[in-house]
Amino acid sequence: MCGRFLRISSLTEVVSAFEATGDSELRLSFNVPPTTTVYAIRHDETRRLVEPMSWGLVPFWAKDTKRASNAINARVETLTEKPSFRHLVKNHRAVMPLDGYFEWDTVTATGSQPKQPYLVRPSIGGEQSFDGMFAAAALWSTWHDPEQEGVALQTVAMVTTQSVGRL
């Protein structure tokens, strides 16, 4: 499961790579945590849009945003079963552009259990280096605040699955 990722590509690079439109430049980050505003690319009637969304899906039916950080990932194996995601699969698909993501491993050499982050990036043709962005599948939703008329929040969850083999 992805809990942090790397975003060092600019809006211009994202727009160009995905042949999309967008006008909200976000701050670059080497450590994007849950609930941060991230880029999500979705399709409207005629074009691809790069939109800022909060990372942590809040279902449209939620009373508040308190559990957003619990829904940063959507497991592909259970997408059609979970109430938060099943209604989004058909019409609320997106991609999240990334430059890498972090996985943590427990280090036991010292006898303690600190977590060590490892940056994961794709390799191209067996090469160990990769300099560029890639995309993760995602689902998005718009949540309307029941307490404040006209206040809406666009949120997104990354679709994840089990890794194949060792990372």
Q: Which residues does each predicted region cover?
A:
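Short linear sequence motif anchored by a di-proline
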Residues: 1-167
